[in-house]
Every structure is written in C-alpha cells, then in structure tokens.
Amino acid sequence: MKGGALHCRCSKCFAAPPKRRVKRRPRVLTLLSLPEDVLLYVLECLPAVDILSMREVHPHLRSLVDSHSSVWARASFQDVWPSPENLNLFERAAECGNFEACVKLGIAYLYNEGLSLSDDGRAEVNGLKASRFFSLTERLNSGADPFVWLFIRPPWSSSGSCCKAVVFDSLKEECGTVTSEEGATGALKGSIQYCLAKVLSLFEDDDKKREALGMLESSASHGCLHSSYLLWETKQKTALSDPGRYLQSFRQLRDYAARGCWDAQISLAKACGHKNQLSQEQRSASELVNQVFQSSLPINKTSIFTTQKGMNDTMRYILIDWLVEVATMKDFSSLCLHMTVGLVDRYLKLRSVPRAKLQLVGIACMVICTRFISKEILTIREAVWLTDNTYKYEDLVRMMGEIISALEGKIRMPTVVDYKDVLSHLIPLDRSTLHLCSYISELSLLYTELSTYSPAQLAAGALLLARILHKQARPWPAQLAETTGFTLEHLTPCVVLLHKKCFHDDAPKDYRQVSLTAVKQRFQDDLYDQISKEKVMDHSHLCELLGVPCRDSESPASCPNAADFHQFLCSPSGSKTKRRREDSIQEDRGSFVTTPTAELSNQEEDLLGDFLDWSLETSCSGYEGDRESEGEREGEVTAPSGVLDLSLLITEHQQCQDTTSDDDSLVPLHPIPLLSKLENGTHSTEGCAEKSSGYSSVSSGGSPTSSSSPPGLPFTPTPGLNHSKLMPIPFPQPCSPLFKASRRQVKRKNQAQHSEDNLSDEL
C-alpha cells in the first residue's frame, strides 16, 4: 500500500471482521416456573404424605400449601389409615374439607382401629370423636344419599357402653343445638336427622319408631328429600283407599321424582301400572317413566382390566360367582346382590387392587350393601369368618373405609333389578316368566361384555328374552315400547348377546375343570320354581325367530392358564361331594386357605386344644357391637378360625391322584364337609360335578354369626341349597409359607350344644 493512498470502505477494498454471535443460555425451566394456578393443581393431586415433602422443598411451595386449604381438601389418602403418627395430617385435611379423611377418621374412632386408646372410657371418647367426623362427612356429602347411619345402625353392644350409642346420642345432641334453620346448616341438620331416624326405625320398640317418624318430619321440614319420600311411603297405605288422597299422594310422588329422588322415580314408574290416575296424570307420569329408562347409561366394566393389570375376566367371574353363593346362603335379596356387584365394579375401576385382596373387596362391598338396604345385616365378624379368616377384622374395617371414600359415599345406584321391578308392574307377568327374567338378570352380572348396554336395556332385554323363551304371542307389546322407549328392533342385539353369554357359551371352569354355576344353583331352588332346570331354546333358533344372522362362533374363553388358576383359586369341595384338594403349592402363595372341614380326634383335641383356644380368642377382635347381637353371650359361638392345615404335608399331586380307593383310611386326606353331620344320608361323588359351582362352602349352621333371623329364633337354611358347599375364594394371603406348608385343615369340635332342628342364628 502506497503512502497517502486512500481506499474506500467497500466490500472489495475493505473486509470487515465478522460479527461474533453471542449464544444465549437456554432458560432453565423448573417446577417453580409453572403458573401458580397450575402449580396449585399439581399439589392438589399429590398424596397427603408427598404434600408435606413438597412443602419443605421451597418457600414458595410452603406458602402455597399453607395459604390454600384446597390443597388439603383434595389430598389423597389412598391406602393410608389413621394412626398416631399421621393423626395430625388426617385432622388437618378433615378440617379443610377432605371427604376421605373424614370418613376414615370416623370409622377409625368408631371401631377403635389404628387409633388405640386406653380401655377406660374408650367408648365415650371414641364415640364423641367419631360423631364429630361423621358430622363433617355429612356436611361434605353433596351428591349421595345420607349414609353415615349404616355405621351406627343396630345391633348395639349389650355389655357395657356402646360406641355406636355414644355416636347416636352425640349427633342427636348436635341437632338440638343447631339454631339456624336455613342454608347449609339447616340442610346438615336435615341429613343428620334422617340418619338418626333410619337408625331408630330399625329397632323393634314402638316408642323408637314413633320417635323416628317425628325426626323424619323435622328432617323433611329442613329440606331433606329422602325424609320426605320416607314419609310419603308411610302414608301411602292409607291414601290408596281414598281416590282424592291417592291423587294428592301421586302428585307428591311426582314432585319428589322430578327433584331427583331415585326411590321416588322407581315408585312413580311402578305406579304407572295402576289405573287410578286421571288420564292427564297418567300421561305425564308415563313421560317421566320414559325419561327414567332413557336416562340410564351403560357402565363400561371392561375398563376394569385397564386399572387392574393382574386381573382378567375369569377372575372377576370367580369373585362374582362366590358372592352369589354367599348371597344365596344368607338369603340376601337380588337387589342386594346387584348392588354389591355394582359397588365392586365401580371400586375396581377407580383403585388398583392386588389379587390377594379381591375377595376382601367383594365381601366388604356386601357388608356395606346389606347395611344400606337390608334389615338383616352381614356383620363384620361373620364376613371375616366367611373368608375362612383369610383376612382379619381390621382388614375388613379398613377396606370399608377405602370403598366408601373412593366412591364418595355413592352406594345406591340404579340396578337391573330396579328396572325389572318397574317392568313387572307395567304389564301382568306370570310367575315362571318373572323368575326366568330374574335368572337372566343375575346371569348378566357375570359377564363384562354385557356392560355395553345400560341397566335399563339389560332389564328390558331380560324380560323380552324370558317372554320369547316361554313362547309368548306378543313378547314386547306396544305398551312396553311406548313406556320405556325401547322397541323390539332396539332390544334385539341385547337379547341375542344375553342368550349367547347366559345359555349358549359354556360357563368358565376352574383348574379342576369344574363349571362355576352359582347362579344356576341359586335358581334351582323351589322358591324360584327350579327355573334354571328348564330347557332353553337353541341359539340358532332364537336368531331365526328374531331374523338376525346366527354367529355360532363362541367368543374366546377368558380362561387363564393353569398357573393363574392355582394362584387364584384352590381346590374346594363341591355340592354334595368330596373333591380332592390340589396339593401343589405355588411360590407366590403361602398356602391354600379353605374352609375347615374335619373334626379333631380326641388325641388331636388334647394336643391342639391350647392352640385352638388361643386362635379362637385372637381371631375375633374389633368393635363389640359388630361381633355380638343383643342376645348373644360369650361361649355360645365356635368360629372356624386358626385351624391347622396338615393335609399340605403331601405336596406331590401324583400321590393324590393315585389314592382313588374308597378305603376309610383315606378319610383324613379328604376331610368331611363341615355340616355333613347335619345332613340326612350320604352322597356319592359320582355324577355331581356338574351341580357344583366350584367352591367348598362354609355353612351357615357353623357360622359364628348370622343375621338372617332374630336372635333366639331357630335358623332355617335356604331351601334347596347345600349348606356345606360355600367356601371363600382362597386368594393368596401374606402368611409364612414355612408354617403353612406343615398345616392340615381341621375344625375344632363345637362346644355349644345344638341340634339339627334348632340352630341358633346368632349375629
């Protein structure tokens, strides 16, 4: 470059240095970077224990947790039970409006489960605390019927102070101190008075019944719809005799139904079958009935297996089949059975349940439902005994709390039985057709594939199928089509599937190839005219009558592998027969738990007496009011608990198969059914397999408690039912395999003297 020469700064003469790009650091996003409302929602979805951990992470999180009560109101306490260690956590959540915490605290104090107190004044202290949390529960109960009364209903303990009575008196005193008659306080008073009236109505004392009627009137004046309906029921009998009163009563019922009372809607639908109403009233009622049927929605039960990873359709079938046997043995109504199954399915859709606790869920749901709709209940002590003490008293109490809290107190839901009863009032039905319809309705409980149809459709389909099978000239008359809104064309697919699942396809079998047919056995009773023994029309013939193509291809049997069966169901004794036990033991099970079925010899009695005395004393713990009726005394009951199972000493399955002789020396290896001594004659094992549902059942005669008749009255078994065949499904239980492997199943001789003609039915 020459000196003094100037150059322009164009791109040809001058190359500017390139600009350096400054790399921006990426923004670090953390949980605290979320908007406050989103962060609050995250905290509300956490379990209660994790909320405390999150609170210690950052001051901002601590501020959110402390300043927003909604975090505690929506905190989850799933699988967590109140204890001295977490009591403050539960109480804080309950005060903030957590429904689950209130329910569990109330039950924990009532049954003295988890929150141990000294025996001195325990009933009084626990009762007052349980009353406080039950009152909070009803305050938070917005969408369900008042239900806390089912925990304090009779029987009450007759020895000393009763915690249930303390809760009742405390709630009654609370209602007397309420001064505000409007708003939420008045509604709470109405709900509590309804619960108190329900409890009083279950006593036999006339004075208590009159007091219950007065409480219902007070509750109805505070706006409790359920109390208004119960008052309507009490006045209905007198209104039937006077046309003017009947019309006024009918209009009241229509008003309650329009306000959402389910029982009123069902009663209104049944009333449409009567011709006492004026034509205008009949028309409006028919429209409401049509709305009741059309508003019924299907419950997709197949989603259960999305939540329950280790469960399949056959496992559910086995559970429901066992519940049917329990309901038959205890003579529970079909409505109670349908409610129980519905409660089981709804809970299984919400909460994941280990396979070992499926039976616990089933029996806990039955305890809840019998308390809710039946005068005779299944006590907690008896429910534990029905599972052959596979679970403890406290296990059942806690499961009841889990179910009630998970379902938010919604126990009573529409069932197939409700709609079936309405249909039976709309048109005249002969006895056999009604029994066949009930039979089909209970069979529908076993199959999840039928849940694609609503309960109203299933009830209508069951009635239509029953009338077709009985060759009715007009199986679906115009009156039913108009009232329900279901035409024959709409119901045809449901009818075909009902027939295919209930009559065409084979029932699932256990690993011993024994069909599970508890519903069929239930309807072989003379009470149902042995309707299940009737020959049913072929599936192809039905399809031909309905004008639909016949698909004979049977759906793939949801039958698990043999290994799954061994884990899920042990070898039980069948109906009127002695079946061999499967002696192989799976590693994931402690042992097979079956109903004690053998008597001890004198020598065995002397050797094992001390152990059995200890086991009987320790197996029946918990709240006394659920263990004894008012007439029961200690020493009158022998429960089959803590039994030794020595038959598992032989673990080779081939050894059992080789012992096919009828020699008497083999009797100890194949114990006699518990109540065989109460049956007349002996039954051979040949030709009886098809009559069994696949369970060896506990007998109500040896039951420690029974709620099917009042104390002191002789127990009458269900007609036509072999009471030596019921037995719990032996789900795997957490027991020591080393101890169980050397146990043999025996039953201690009953010390209480009783005869076949007079078995005390104790609670």
UniProtKB/Swiss-Prot annotation:
Gene Ontology annotations of biological process type: cell division; negative regulation of centrosome duplication; protein ubiquitination; SCF-dependent proteasomal ubiquitin-dependent protein catabolic process
Which residues lie in Basic and acidic residues bias regions?
580-590
Q: Where is the composition biased (Basic residues)?
A: 741-751
Keywords per UniProt: Cell cycle, Cell division, Cyclin, Cytoplasm, Cytoskeleton, Mitosis, Nucleus, Ubl conjugation pathway
In which residues does the motif D box 2 occur? 355-358
Residue span(s) of domain F-box:
28-75
Task: Please give the family membership noted in the entry.
Answer: Belongs to the cyclin family. Cyclin AB subfamily.
Q: Which PANTHER family match?
A: CYCLINS
Q: What does this protein do?
A: Substrate recognition component of the SCF(CCNF) E3 ubiquitin-protein ligase complex which mediates the ubiquitination and subsequent proteasomal degradation of target proteins. The SCF(CCNF) E3 ubiquitin-protein ligase complex is an integral component of the ubiquitin proteasome system (UPS) and links proteasome degradation to the cell cycle. Mediates the substrate recognition and the proteasomal degradation of various target proteins during G2 phase involved in the regulation of cell cycle progression and in the maintenance of genome stability.
What is this protein identified as?
Cyclin-F
Q: Which organism is it from?
A: Xenopus tropicalis (Western clawed frog)
